[in-house]
């Protein structure tokens, strides 16, 4: 339905995504071009295979996790276990969901001795000094709306301050509003 309204095509979302998917060769070409121009390459994995490709094959130095995967504990755990810094998009998440995601990341970065991955272990990792230190060193929260394009009235820039105060982490904005007006707000 989205494609029909906004793109004007009858193809399914799966067909569209398969058509737009970059090959491994295209990734290598893009990352080489970025390195030649001293541009930091960044990519978002949406599954464990893509995460492995980015970390093991392309050897990226940072990951971005999309809002839709904020509750994908296996992906979050594997991403943090890579040791790479992570930009975590928060989309429509409640603070409790962000805290749960941060618990998974804290566990992946600094697993408490002998703990198996589970909700209780994630909470302990989030509350631990080692987990907090890892989060502060490695994680940036990204405030964003999930509407494309987003009306200025929906930008809710105060959410960034709330996240910064709640989690004491670096916070940024993924701006989906048209133009640059939101960037000029104080």
Question: PLM ranges: what are they?
Answer:
Residues 1-186:
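Catalytic cores and adjacent flexible loops of soluble metabolic enzymes
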């Amino acid at each position: 339905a989205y494609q029909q309204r906004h793109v004007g095509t009858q193809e399914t979302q799966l067909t569209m995504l398969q058509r737009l998917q970059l090959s491994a060769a295209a990734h290598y070409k893009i990352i080489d071009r970025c390195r030649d121009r001293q541009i930091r390459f960044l990519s978002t994995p949406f599954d464990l295979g893509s995460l492995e490709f980015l970390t093991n094959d392309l050897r990226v130095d940072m990951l971005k996790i999309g809002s839709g995967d904020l509750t994908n504990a296996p992906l979050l755990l594997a991403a943090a276990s890579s040791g790479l810094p992570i930009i975590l998009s928060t989309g429509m998440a409640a603070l409790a969901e962000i805290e749960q995601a941060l618990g998974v990341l804290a566990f992946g970065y600094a697993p408490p001795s002998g703990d198996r991955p589970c909700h209780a272990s994630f909470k302990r990792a989030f509350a631990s000094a080692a987990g907090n230190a890892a989060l502060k060193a490695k994680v940036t929260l990204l405030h964003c709306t999930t509407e494309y394009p987003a009306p200025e009235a929906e930008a809710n820039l105060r959410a960034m301050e709330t996240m910064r105060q709640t989690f004491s982490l670096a916070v940024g904005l993924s701006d989906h509003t048209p133009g640059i007006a939101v960037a000029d707000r104080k």
